[in-house]
Structures are given as C-alpha cells and as structure tokens.
Design a protein with these regions (language model features):
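Short, well-ordered loop/turn elements at secondary-structure boundaries
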Residues: 80-83, 197, 210-213, 523-526, ...
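Short, solvent-exposed loop/turn elements at domain surfaces
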Residues: 94-99, 225-227, 548
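Short, surface-exposed beta-strand/loop micro-motifs that present aromatic residues
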Residues: 74-78, 204-206, 526-531
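Hydrophobic/aromatic-rich, well-ordered segments within soluble, folded domains that form packed cores
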Residues: 76-96, 235-255, 639-641
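Noncatalytic, helix-rich "gating/capping" subdomain that lines the substrate-entry/channel surface
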Residues: 63, 119-430, 466-469, 481-493
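Arg/Lys-rich, intrinsically disordered low-complexity tails that mediate electrostatic binding
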Residues: 1-30, 50
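Intrinsically disordered, low-complexity linker/terminal regions across diverse proteins
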Residues: 57-60, 270, 276, 295-307, ...
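Extracellular/luminal recognition modules and glycoprotein regions
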Residues: 35, 40-118
Length: 731
C-alpha cells in the first residue's frame, strides 16, 4: 500500500490524451481505438439493478438467504444421482419446466438445435420482409410474389384443376401400348425434385463416389411412404393398423382432390404397388452387387436389366445419354424394372402414378396440406401440430430459389468473425488431439493406421459458409406457389443435367421426402455441422456458430468444449466410422482396411450396440441400436477427444488440481445440459425406428460411462447404472 501524498507543483499536463470523462461510473477514453465488441466482459449491473426491488437495494440479507437455499437444495429428486443417471440428474428441472409455444409444436424433438433453427427461420423471414420494404427493384418484387405464394398457398380451385390435368396426363401415357411412354412418364416425374423420391426409380446427380471431384448420374430405389419398413412385411396387429392408416390417407387424398364419387381409382392400390416394389430387394438371380456402388453402363442397363437408360435420359432432357450410371442395388434394378415394365399401365399402377402427383398438389394447397400432415406428421412422426408459422414456411420454401440472397443477408446480420476464428482454432487443435489418439492406437495395423492419419491430416474444414454461391435466378415468380415451385425446379433440373460428368460445386438441397420438408445441403443458415465422406470435409454452418452452442462473452473453455467442441470431435470421428472409413483422404470409395482390422472394428461396433441396447432396455425401451452405430461411435470418440483437449489445456495453464476437478465437472455438466431434449408425446416410436442418433439420454450417459476421468471424478463403481464393463473409447 502506497501512502497518499500530495506534491506541490508536480502535476503534469496530459499532452498525449484528451481529458478522461467519468460517466455513470465508467471510465472512457474518447480517443480509444478498442472496439467494445472485442471485450468479452459486458457491462450489465446498471440495467440488472433496475430489476431489484427497492428493499433489495437497501438490504441484501433476504437475497443472500434465498441464494443459500437454492445452493443447498437438490436440483433433482433424491432418486436421481450422478452415479445412476447423469443426464436426468442435470436436466431434471429443464425437462420438467420446458414450455413451447403452439407455433413451435410442429417440432417433434425440442432441443437447442431445433429451437434455435426455429428462431433462425423467424430471422430469415424478417430479413426478407425488410428487404421488400426497403427496396423497389426486380428482386424485391420477386421476393414479395414468392413469399405471398407461400403464405397464401394454392387455392383449392386451382389445385383441383391441376389434379384433373395430371389424371389426364397419366391416362394419356398409360392408355398407350408404347413402352417408351413409361420412360417418358418416369423422366417427367424425376424432373421435379418435390415428387422424384416417390418414383419407382429415382434419378439424381451426385458426386461420383469413385471419382469424387466429378458428378455422375445415380439411380436410387423408390423412397417408401411408411417409415417403419417392417410394416410392409409384417402381418401383426401393429402392422395392419399402420397399413390401414396409410390406406385411409390415400383415400382422403383421392376423394378430396378429385371429388368423392367422381373418380374410379382404388386408393388401396398405392400400398399394393409399394409392397410389390419392396419385395424386389430380395429377388434372386443377380450376384454382381458389391456394396452400394454398382456402375452400370448404357448397354448393360438394357441388355442385362431391361432398364432403358437411353429413353429415360432423353425424357429427362439429355441430348446424349451418359455412358453409365451408378445404383445402390442391382437386385432392385433388375427385379423392379421387370415388375414396372410388366404392370406400368395396369389400373393398379395407374392409381400409383396419379398418387405421386396428387400428394405434391395437396402439400402446396391451403387446408389440403392437413391431409399430408395427418399421416406423415401426426401419425408417423408424432407431430403435435401442423406448422402454421408463415416465417417457417417462407424460409424453407424460399431457400430453394433465393439461397444466395438469404445467405448474404444472414452473413450480413449474423456473422461474427471472432467466433469463426475461435471455431477454426478449435477445429485444428481437436484434429491434432484426435491424430495423437490414433498414433497411440494399439489395435490398428501399421498400414491401416497410416491411412487413418493421412485421412485426418487432409480433412478440410469449411466454417460458416461456402466460398462460392451461384446467382439466384429471377424467373418471373407470381403469387401461385405450385407454378413458382415448378419454375425453380425446372431451372434447377436443367442445371443438374449440365453438371453430369463435370466438376462438383456446392448445391443447396432440400429433402422433400421428409415432413416437414428440411434443408439437406450446406446452407449457411442451417443450425448444424456435418461430415461429407465424398469430400473428406467438415462443414460447420454459420447458423450453428452462435449461442448457446458457442459463447464468446461469458463462458469458459469448458462450456465451449462441451458444445461446439464436442460437435467438432463428433464430426472428426465420422471420418473413421463405419461409413466414413470406406472413403480415402480424397473422398473416393477405397478399401484401405486390412481384413484383420475390419474384424476387430466390427467386434467393437457390436459391443457398442450392445451397450446402447442394454441402457435402453433398463428404461423398457426395445429398439435396434445398430441403425445408429456410426453416430454412437462418434459420440464416444468425441468425448475422448474433448477429455484429452481439456487435460492439455489445464497442463498448458498449470491449473491447480482443485480447479482441474471443478473444470472437468463443469465440462460434463455442460455436456449433459447441451444434450437436453424433450420428445413430443407420440414421437418416440418413429425416433427409435428412423433416427440414427440415439435418444439424448443415452448420447449423454454412454459416452460418459466410458470416460475414465468421469468415472473417477464421480466415483462410479460396479453396480452403479453409470458403470459399464469397459472404458474403451474405440480409438
């Protein structure tokens, strides 16, 4: 402590800085070059104090007592403990108190990802409306027209005319004995992204998995309407009820769009055709199938499988048929082609063709979308309410024609360079940690380990948004939604045709087989992160680089590691999981594993599956955990990566042992909390059948049960429910 003294005539004039002002207790240098945004600590007390009662400003005793009570009381019932159920122990109060608005009840999984995505939809729509209000140009007119068409949807009168028009078209095709009409019909359906997945054969342009820098044509099987595939084969009461609901849905569709009693279609035929198609997977006589990549030349298609590639590509709009296509199943190609050629113009198949068009029309029509929702949303997915938010609908539909506009608006308003740099740094450091783990690996052979390290070394991180965006086409949109979607899909289809055999570029995609429709590409405004094997790259969308997934202001390394750090580790792990491990460092399909390593790896997969099955069984949930093996292994591996990163971070900073303990406890607490999720009441069955991600309770407890540090920190012993018989973290 220095004694306070005053010296005469020693006051020096400040000649280098302007006078320091004192305002509201804050010292400010008027000539400061420091951007307040760069300071993580934000002033809050002046505003926060206004929330206090007058008595609290004068006396702090009651507030102290309240805080003490909160700290001492249990935040979960005594039946829950870290030793037995860490997920519910941490999230009990959140799960108990979660409230969602009616407009959010189109969501079936209430978690941070989906709730933030819902908010992003609102933000995107606000950017659209702000631009329309502030500008008078062609773009603002096209935006206004398209948004109006989405909000109003098609009128019933217009849609009924469209339905009858498509009935006439199908009759014209099917009443001909010319088999070329079949391929014209198939090509016509595949030229529209909204309905292509319903066709018996689905054409698509995608990166060639054995030459991933170029596109090629793929022929995929039909995307089946019923999510639980076993229903098509089973005759149980559950399966019969499921099929009955689908038949009712089809009947409602035909009767509503064509008029009850005004058509001769038997809606039951739709299910019969889908059953015929699904049984072709088991047909015999084709032995050439090798995995999901089967190259079929133009001549082979017709000579060996009867598949008229020449006529189909002509109908699609090709001037010359590509020399080959790739398919995932030669059995399906062979047998589904035979059935289709034999029955395509029968009354049963005629109903099926008409159904493909009717379901699209209903989806874009005011009130008729309810038909789609009732089966695909409410019955199949457990959705509590149909989406009736104009902002959500506008953002989803307008992302197809205006992706570049939306991307630029989102970057302009939400890009945080500091956060992007933080994520980039974390990506590179976590990759180093993962590579170190692989170097220490004891069960991989030297050959396989060398390739694994090469693959990790060459992973590309794309953070925030894609570097190149194509110009949005302004196609003279009107206020008719069906016509607008036709215009943009026709434009996109022509561009897809031009890409066949050409170098790959980024294309924003939509999954129209999902309900509600979802974005499936690398749109910057999606709240997600993903690994793409064909590119050996990890894309972290800008929509994900925000609170609560990363906090640059008030949280520490433990918080960010548990959130975005864990996600990065998860995506890194996908490079070596059951799917990613089939591709090399350049993104091409290549078998770089020794037979012995494959055998060990498969054994580990089975052991992981058994743990997820066992943990679910304790809650009386029976499901096939094998569908999520890649995701489950990525979770386990990611936890090991962040564990080691935090250890190194503490070593670097020479952290006190007591603080290290608190640091790890914070990491695991934040991890459990960021995994919190509430399912809609009737959504569980669909999630277990279709979602490759396990329920978040198991995504939390199982990776933690394999962490040696977690086990030691919480003194987990054999007999505790958080105990597992090994702490193997795969790599």
């Amino acid at each position: 402590t220095r004694k306070n003294t005053t010296r005469k005539n020693t006051t020096r004039k400040n000649t280098t800085r302007k006078k320091i002002k004192i305002t509201q207790g804050l010292i400010k240098r008027e000539d400061s070059l420091i951007d307040p945004k760069c300071v993580s600590l934000k002033p809050f007390q002046a505003k926060f104090e206004k929330q206090f009662s007058k008595s609290l400003v004068k006396s702090n005793q009651s507030f102290k007592k309240k805080i003490a009570r909160q700290l001492l009381q249990q935040f979960a019932p005594t039946r829950l403990s870290p030793k037995n159920d860490f997920y519910n122990y941490i999230n009990y109060m959140w799960l108990k108190n979660l409230e969602v608005s009616d407009k959010q009840k189109y969501i079936v999984q209430f978690d941070d990802f989906r709730l933030v995505q819902d908010r992003v939809y609102q933000e995107l729509d606000q950017h659209i409306m702000d631009y329309i209000k502030s500008n008078k140009n062609r773009l603002s007119t096209e935006l206004k027209n398209f948004r109006t068409s989405v909000v109003n949807m098609n009128t019933k009168e217009n849609s009924r005319k469209l339905a009858l028009k498509h009935v006439d078209y199908v009759n014209e095709m099917c009443n001909s004995n010319d088999e070329n009409k079949l391929w014209q019909l198939l090509g016509h359906i595949n030229s529209d992204e909204m309905i292509a997945s319903s066709a018996p054969f689905v054409w698509s342009i995608a990166p060639n998995e054995k030459q991933s820098t170029n596109y090629c044509s793929y022929i995929y099987p039909h995307s089946f309407s019923i999510l639980d595939i076993n229903v098509y084969f089973d005759k149980s009461s559950y399966a019969n009820n499921y099929k009955s609901e689908f038949r009712k849905h089809c009947k409602k569709l035909f009767d509503t769009l064509l008029g009850k009693g005004n058509h001769n279609f038997n809606p039951n035929d739709v299910l019969d055709v889908e059953i015929e198609l699904i049984y072709t997977y088991d047909c015999k006589g084709v032995m050439e199938t090798k995995g999901n990549y089967n190259k079929v030349t133009k001549n082979e298609a017709m000579d060996k499988y009867g598949f008229n590639w020449e006529e189909l590509t002509k109908a699609l709009g090709y001037k010359t048929a590509p020399s080959f296509f790739v398919t995932s199943s030669l059995e399906y190609l062979n047998c589904a082609t035979k059935i289709m050629k034999e029955k395509w113009n029968s009354e049963k198949w005629k109903t099926y063709w008409v159904w493909i068009f009717l379901r699209q029309i209903a989806r874009v029509t005011r009130d008729w979308e309810e038909i789609t929702y009732k089966f695909h949303g409410e019955f199949q997915r457990g959705q509590e309410k149909i989406n009736y938010s104009d902002s959500v609908s506008a953002s989803l539909y307008m992302s197809v024609p205006f992706n570049t506009f939306l991307t630029n608006q989102y970057l302009k308003n939400h890009k945080n360079p500091k956060a992007l740099l933080y994520v980039k740094t974390l990506c590179e450091d976590l990759k180093i940690v993962f590579m170190r783990i692989i170097k220490r690996n004891k069960w991989l052979s030297p050959k396989t380990k060398k390739y694994a390290l090469l693959k990790l070394k060459n992973i590309e991180f794309v953070i925030g948004h894609m570097a190149k965006l194509r110009e949005d086409p302004l196609l003279g949109y009107t206020t008719n939604l069906y016509d607008n979607m036709k215009k943009i899909h026709t434009w996109r289809h022509k561009r897809f045709i031009e890409l066949d055999g050409k170098p790959t570029i980024d294309i924003p995609l939509m999954d129209w087989s999902a309900y509600p429709v979802k974005m499936a590409g690398n749109q910057a405004y999606v709240v997600n992160a993903s690994y793409t094997p064909a590119k050996n790259s990890i894309f972290i969308n800008l929509g994900y680089i925000q609170k609560p997934f990363i906090d640059m202001d008030e949280r520490g390394i433990e918080y960010n590691l548990a959130n975005i750090g864990f996600t990065i580790g998860h995506e890194l792990s996908h490079a070596l999981d059951d799917w990613g491990s089939k591709y090399d460092d350049k993104g091409n399909l290549y078998d770089w594993w020794t037979p012995k390593d494959k055998k060990i790896f498969k054994k580990m997969q089975n052991e992981v599956t058994s743990q997820y099955t066992e943990f679910a069984k304790r809650d009386k949930i029976i499901y096939d955990a094998a569908i999520g093996i890649g995701e489950n292994m990525a979770d386990i591996s990611a936890m090991a990566i962040v564990d080691e990163y935090l250890r190194d971070f503490q070593e670097k900073n020479n952290t006190l042992p007591a603080i290290r303990s608190l640091s790890y406890e914070a990491l695991y607490t934040y991890y459990a909390f960021q995994m919190k999720q509430q399912l809609a009441t009737n959504a569980l069955a669909a999630q277990l059948k279709t979602n490759p991600h396990a329920l978040d309770k198991y995504r939390t407890n199982i990776p933690l049960s394999r962490s040696q540090i977690f086990r030691a920190l919480f003194n987990i012993k054999k007999g505790d429910k958080m105990w597992w018989n090994n702490t193997n973290t795969i790599w």
